[in-house]
Amino acid sequence: MEKQYVLAIDQGTTSSRAMLFDRQGKVAGVAQREFGQIFPQPGWVEHNPREIMTSVYTTITELLNNAQIDARAIAGIGITNQRETAVVWDKATGQPIYNAIVWQSRQTKDICAQLKEAGHEQMVRDKTGLLIDAYFSGTKVKWILDHVEGARERAQKGELAFGTIDSWLIWNLTGGKVHVTDYTNASRTMMFNIHTLQWDAELLAMLDVPAQMLPEVRSSSEVYGMTQTQYFYGEQVPIAGIAGDQQAALFGQACFEPGMAKNTYGTGCFMLMNTGDKAVASKAGLLTTIAWGIDGKVEYALEGAIFVAGSVVQWLRDGLRMLGKASDSQAYAERAGDNDGVYIVPAFVGLGAPYWRSDIRGAVFGLTRGTTKEHFVRAAVESMAYQTRDVLTAMQSDSGIELKELRADGGAIANDFMAQFQSDILNVPVLRPEVAETTALGAAYLAGLATGFWSSREEIAKQWAVDRRFEPAMADDKRQALYAGWQQAVEATMGFRIS
């Protein structure tokens, strides 16, 4: 049967999605399933790995049934995933020995403090391009081995496996036959040397993580293995692409040339700039990471990770009951007229790039008796744009490249007010693509290249198209005044302490 589609599995922080893409890179079908969040203690975030797999299996079945697609028409599967989230499981039974510790979780912050006190920061920075932070997988694995009885001894015997979510999905989809990850996910573990492209013995010793439990690191676009037949009605489908969610979005946005950048506005906000074959060491609080590895060549990116973006609107909706639904935020923000001097610094789990302060809480500034919920909503939406400017300033400083345009994706960019305000605050055009699901599309492209469904990156780049281009329209003095207010709010937030 002729291959007509590529399937992307997009395993995110709050839901799993399965999506079909045709040869034109258009969405041909989608299914989505949410799963539970576990909060054992303040600042801790965990997932049940079995529940994640159930959500993935369910979406695949729903997608095939709803789209009435014959599995033989699927050329391959691309996987993209929430990065850094760590799973440890028993190789014999396939059962996790603890919950998955999520990228947002701060439960390893004490381990990070100890590593910093021991003087490991520069070594980690030089080898991994990362900072010592609870965000990354390495300290999560150490925490599991430290806290689950007998785990480290079992890991040393080769009885346990570690993986980021991509590894966990592939292990299960192949029936335990394949234990792999790709360069992008490995580069987020704090255990992988992004220059030698190997798991690093010194980093593993620092974390006391046995090498026997680590997955094999492969390229981002190749056939890793075949699915078991029960998931695709008796057919085996090749799993042929892997990328962490933000790198997948960079690929899906066709940012193939050095200096091209994208920003994804989701739960958090993640801005990546392609730096080509050069791993640019950041002096301004950004991360150096692997963009992808294809055809024997690795390319790099600078990244600014903002921990709280769209979730600040969710907080207004669910926590403060100011909104009926998140999509109402555009109307509320426009109705406010301006922010009336109100700033929200959404440091609910500290601040990420370029500040990297896990010890601070969020704050609201500039309240008066005249402050309305519309002002709150506008300040929340504006906070995404201000944080993005913080990151862009650092990115241009590190790279020496002045950004010509920003390709934007993610749920929040559907908000026209947000997109226009972002362009105004950056003084850079913001481009929203026709296909909004760029993360899943990037994974599909990687799998499609490996299976010959698409011939080249040049073919992919021609498919990328703009839905709407937002041009800067704000006076420069107003832009600078608004941003100065934000900077004051951040400075005040970092100076506030609760004993």
From Swiss-Prot:
EC number: 2.7.1.30
Residues passing through the membrane, by range: none
Cellular compartments per GO CC: cytosol
Top-rank lineage group of the source organism: Bacteria
Binding of glycerol, residues: R83, E84, Y135, D245, Q246
Gene Ontology terms, MF aspect: ATP binding; glycerol kinase activity
InterPro entries: ATPase_NBD, Carb_kinase_FGGY, Carb_kinase_FGGY_CS, FGGY_C, FGGY_N, Glycerol_kin
Presence of the UniProt keyword S-adenosyl-L-methionine in the record: no
Keyword annotations from UniProtKB, A to Z: ATP-binding, Glycerol metabolism, Kinase, Nucleotide-binding, Transferase
Pathway: Polyol metabolism; glycerol degradation via glycerol kinase pathway; sn-glycerol 3-phosphate from glycerol: step 1/1
GO terms classed as biological process: glycerol catabolic process; glycerol metabolic process; glycerol-3-phosphate metabolic process
Catalytic activity: glycerol + ATP = sn-glycerol 3-phosphate + ADP + H(+)
Binding-site list for ADP: T13, R17, T267, G310, G411, N415
Class of the enzyme per the UniProt entry, highest EC level: transferase
Residues reported in the UniProt entry to bind sn-glycerol 3-phosphate: T13, R83, E84, Y135, D245
Primary role: Key enzyme in the regulation of glycerol uptake and metabolism. Catalyzes the phosphorylation of glycerol to yield sn-glycerol 3-phosphate.
Family per record: Belongs to the FGGY kinase family.
Protein's recorded name: Glycerol kinase
The species this protein was found in: Xanthomonas axonopodis pv. citri (strain 306)
Gene: glpK
